[in-house]
Protein backbone atom coordinates (compact mmCIF):
# COMPACT_ATOMS: atom_id res chain seq x y z
CA UNK A 1 0.00 0.00 0.00
CA UNK A 2 1.78 3.07 -1.26
CA UNK A 3 0.84 6.15 0.77
CA UNK A 4 2.19 9.69 0.83
CA UNK A 5 1.73 11.72 3.97
CA UNK A 6 0.31 15.26 3.84
CA UNK A 7 2.87 17.86 2.77
CA UNK A 8 2.01 20.46 5.38
CA UNK A 9 1.32 24.12 4.69
CA UNK A 10 3.53 27.10 3.98
CA UNK A 11 3.36 30.73 5.11
CA UNK A 12 4.64 32.02 1.77
CA UNK A 13 2.78 32.55 -1.48
CA UNK A 14 1.67 36.20 -1.34
CA UNK A 15 2.90 39.28 -3.14
CA UNK A 16 1.34 42.70 -3.62
CA UNK A 17 0.75 44.27 -7.01
CA UNK A 18 3.15 46.98 -8.15
CA UNK A 19 1.74 50.48 -7.46
CA UNK A 20 3.33 52.25 -10.47
CA UNK A 21 4.85 55.04 -8.40
CA UNK A 22 7.43 57.53 -9.60
CA UNK A 23 7.95 60.57 -11.80
CA UNK A 24 5.56 60.64 -14.77
CA UNK A 25 6.66 63.96 -16.33
CA UNK A 26 10.31 64.97 -16.24
CA UNK A 27 11.99 68.39 -16.12
CA UNK A 28 11.52 70.46 -19.26
CA UNK A 29 8.45 68.54 -20.44
CA UNK A 30 5.39 70.55 -21.42
CA UNK A 31 2.24 69.63 -19.47
CA UNK A 32 -1.41 70.59 -19.48
CA UNK A 33 -3.36 71.54 -16.36
CA UNK A 34 -4.45 68.38 -14.54
CA UNK A 35 -1.50 66.27 -15.74
CA UNK A 36 -0.02 63.99 -13.09
CA UNK A 37 3.65 64.80 -12.53
CA UNK A 38 4.61 62.41 -9.69
CA UNK A 39 2.92 59.54 -7.89
CA UNK A 40 4.54 59.02 -4.49
CA UNK A 41 4.14 57.74 -0.96
CA UNK A 42 4.66 60.67 1.40
CA UNK A 43 6.23 63.93 0.24
CA UNK A 44 9.52 62.97 -1.39
CA UNK A 45 8.73 65.88 -3.73
CA UNK A 46 6.86 68.99 -2.60
CA UNK A 47 4.42 71.11 -4.59
CA UNK A 48 5.84 74.39 -5.92
CA UNK A 49 4.21 77.06 -8.10
CA UNK A 50 1.22 75.94 -10.18
CA UNK A 51 1.34 72.43 -8.71
CA UNK A 52 -1.32 70.81 -6.52
CA UNK A 53 -1.01 67.95 -4.06
CA UNK A 54 -3.65 65.20 -3.94
CA UNK A 55 -4.92 63.14 -1.03
CA UNK A 56 -2.34 60.43 -1.71
CA UNK A 57 0.46 63.02 -2.19
CA UNK A 58 0.21 62.84 -5.98
CA UNK A 59 1.54 66.05 -7.53
CA UNK A 60 -0.36 67.44 -10.51
CA UNK A 61 -0.20 70.54 -12.71
CA UNK A 62 -2.74 73.30 -12.04
CA UNK A 63 -1.66 75.32 -15.10
CA UNK A 64 -0.19 74.70 -18.54
CA UNK A 65 3.58 75.06 -18.84
CA UNK A 66 6.93 73.34 -18.40
CA UNK A 67 7.93 71.13 -15.48
CA UNK A 68 10.80 72.45 -13.36
CA UNK A 69 12.53 70.56 -10.55
CA UNK A 70 14.38 72.58 -7.91
CA UNK A 71 16.07 72.02 -4.56
CA UNK A 72 15.63 74.80 -2.02
CA UNK A 73 15.31 75.62 1.64
CA UNK A 74 17.51 74.76 4.61
CA UNK A 75 16.55 71.07 4.39
CA UNK A 76 17.28 70.80 0.64
CA UNK A 77 13.71 69.87 -0.16
CA UNK A 78 12.86 68.92 -3.73
CA UNK A 79 10.14 71.13 -5.19
CA UNK A 80 8.33 70.75 -8.50
CA UNK A 81 6.92 73.84 -10.20
CA UNK A 82 5.21 74.59 -13.49
CA UNK A 83 6.69 77.54 -15.38
CA UNK A 84 4.17 79.18 -17.70
CA UNK A 85 5.31 79.44 -21.30
Swiss-Prot record:
Keywords: Ribonucleoprotein, Ribosomal protein. GO terms for biological process: translation. The keyword Transcription does not apply. GO terms for molecular function: structural constituent of ribosome. It comes from the Bacteria. The keyword Ribonucleoprotein applies. One of its GO terms (cellular component) is cytosolic large ribosomal subunit. Residues 1-21 are annotated as: Disordered. HAMAP family: Ribosomal_bL27. Belongs to the bacterial ribosomal protein bL27 family. NCBIfam families: L27. This is Large ribosomal subunit protein bL27.
Amino acid sequence: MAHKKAGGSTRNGRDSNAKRLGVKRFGGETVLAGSIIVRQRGTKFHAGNNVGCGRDHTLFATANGKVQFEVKGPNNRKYISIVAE
